[in-house]
Curated annotation (Swiss-Prot):
Cellular component terms (Gene Ontology): cytosol
Keywords: ATP-binding, Cytoplasm, Kinase, Nucleotide-binding, Transferase
Enzyme class: transferase
Matching Gene3D superfamilies: P-loop containing nucleotide triphosphate hydrolases (3.40.50.300)
Source organism of the structure: Pseudomonas savastanoi pv. phaseolicola (strain 1448A / Race 6) (Pseudomonas syringae pv. phaseolicola (strain 1448A / Race 6))
GO molecular function, one term: dCMP kinase activity
Pfam families, A to Z: Cytidylate_kin
Gene: cmk
Catalysed reaction, written as an equation: CMP + ATP = CDP + ADP; dCMP + ATP = dCDP + ADP
Descriptive protein name: Cytidylate kinase
Length: 229
């Protein structure tokens, strides 16, 4: 029987830094990267492009099964480009409206089922770093290392505010905090695959930690468990 490539999962709420940490970790290890949140953002983005209502579960399920999407590594390992139906949407799917839509469609059981096998297909040699909200609980429950990364809602809103201001966006810190709290409630209260730590996950609060400190903590766990060579 073929031994599957190892997986490290990094779950957590919006703005916890999981995407940044996962990208840095994947590059450090030379592993594949799954940004599962991007799949839900892509679905919400495609739904709006095709006039599909975000409450129409059957139509969204069909759209999810036939998403024409590619993830392409950029030069020198600087992240990835996301191509949807031939168009580079890497930045277009990162706005707050698409993020809110992603949270909506992620609460639909049929949509999650449609994307499950698609996510598991990313598990390839030499290994996979997967970030999202249910990577350790649902998608890769047998992963040898599971991280649940969090931070206070206020700190997560502050980080997002600084990101958006740096891009020149006109945003309000208070409105971002409201949106993060609303997303937290949707993600933790949904009936299917709610946001929660896996029973065997290592929980890290990054409120007062730098990205580098979080990465070092995870690398220490990898070394301790002998996961990456």
């Amino acid at each position: 029987m073929k031994i599957k490539a190892p997986v490290i999962t990094i779950d957590g709420p919006s703005g916890s830094g999981k995407g940044t940490v996962a990208g840095l970790l994947a590059r450090k290890l030379g592993w594949c990267l799954l940004d599962s949140g991007a799949l839900y953002r892509l679905l919400a983005f495609a739904a709006r492009n095709h006039g599909v209502d975000l409450t129409n579960e059957e139509a969204l399920k069909l759209l999810a099964a036939h998403l024409d999407v590619q993830f392409e590594a950029t030069a020198a390992g600087q992240g990835q480009r996301i191509i949807l139906e031939g168009e580079d949407v890497t930045h277009a799917i990162r706005n707050e409206q698409v993020g809110s839509g992603a949270s909506q469609v992620a609460s639909l059981p049929a949509v999650r089922d449609a994307l499950l096998l698609r996510q598991r297909a990313f598990q390839e040699e030499p290994g996979l770093v997967a970030d999202g909200r249910d990577m350790g609980t649902v998608v890769f429950p047998d992963a040898p290392l599971k991280i649940f990364l969090t931070a206070s809602a206020e700190e997560r809103a502050r980080r997002r505010y600084l990101q958006l201001k740096a891009k020149g966006d006109d945003v309000s810190l208070s409105s971002l905090l409201d949106e993060i709290c609303a997303r937290d409630e949707r993600d933790t209260q949904r009936a299917v695959a709610p946001l929660k730590p896996a029973h065997d996950a290592i929980q890290l609060d990054s409120t007062e930690l730098s990205i580098e400190q979080v990465l070092e903590r995870i690398l220490s766990e990898i070394a301790l468990r002998g996961i990456a060579g």
